[in-house]
């Protein structure tokens, strides 16, 4: 499987999200994510605007669904999303409902193991319930709280190989990764590389001489796309 680059549009304004998305697509980004802040601020309008502007591009709606699984997934599918996100900590029936909506509306389901006491078991459970992808996720508040207590901040890379080995579906690692770490994810067997807003501006190794963000993103995409993901041959 060829590595995929996804940009998380964690913005709160449609116009800004569309400008960033256009820049990202020109640079070679494969998937767009309507991030949770964009969905909270703009709702279905944000997803519809992305679909209207980028008709052939996969769009992930990061709903973080916890209940009302079928309706939420259905609404996002009708707005133009191709992928929706459900949380492993949701009730099993909610996950099943999202998966059913995905099948009914031709939308892929990404299961997020954020907050699971056993992250590997959470990933496996998501796969067993029918999720098409697993997001291995260390949350923002989790990382901040642990660091504030003077402990080592956890990283999704800590257990990424274990998660990848536990499931057959593609895995994405999210949460506090530096740009260089995100680019390394395919070498752990995780082919879906997500770039959050901070990652596109803070990595010196990928900044162009004139600070051109599009040029930097192009270098990042080339670095990811040039890799071969261990364990994936398709």
Regions found by a protein language model. Name each.
Residues 26-30, 53-57, 78-83, 103-108, ...:
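Glycine-enriched alpha-helix->loop->beta-strand junction motifs that scaffold or abut catalytic
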Residues 115-166, 174:
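Active-site rim beta-loop-alpha module in soluble metabolic enzymes
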Residues 81-93, 134-146, 188-217:
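Glycine-rich phosphate-binding active-site loops on the catalytic face of alpha/beta enzymes
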Residues 41, 69, 93, 119, ...:
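Generic structural signal for helix capping and beta-alpha/helix-loop junctions
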Residues 20, 68-79, 117-129, 166, ...:
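Catalytic cores of alpha/beta
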């Amino acid at each position: 499987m060829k590595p995929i680059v996804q940009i998380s549009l964690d913005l709160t304004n449609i116009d800004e999200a569309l400008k960033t998305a256009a820049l990202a697509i020109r640079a070679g980004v494969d998937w767009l994510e309507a991030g949770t802040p964009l969905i909270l601020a703009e709702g279905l309008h944000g997803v519809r605007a992305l679909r209207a502007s980028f008709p052939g591009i996969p769009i992930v709606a990061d709903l973080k669904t916890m209940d009302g699984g079928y309706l939420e997934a259905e609404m996002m599918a009708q707005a133009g999303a191709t992928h929706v996100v459900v949380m492993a900590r949701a009730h099993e029936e909610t996950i099943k409902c999202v998966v059913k909506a995905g099948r009914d509306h031709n939308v892929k389901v990404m299961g997020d193991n954020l907050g699971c006491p056993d992250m590997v078991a959470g990933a496996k459970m998501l796969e067993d319930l029918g999720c098409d992808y697993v997001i291995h996720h260390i949350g923002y508040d989790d990382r901040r709280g642990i660091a504030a207590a003077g402990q080592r901040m956890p990283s999704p890379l800590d257990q990424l190989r274990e998660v990848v080995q536990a499931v057959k579906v593609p895995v994405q690692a999210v949460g506090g990764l530096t740009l260089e770490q995100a680019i390394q994810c395919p070498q752990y067997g995780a082919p879906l590389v997500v770039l959050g807003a901070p990652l596109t501006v803070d990595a010196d190794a990928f900044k162009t001489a004139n600070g051109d963000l599009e040029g930097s993103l192009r270098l990042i995409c080339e670095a990811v796309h040039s890799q071969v993901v261990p364990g994936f041959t398709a």
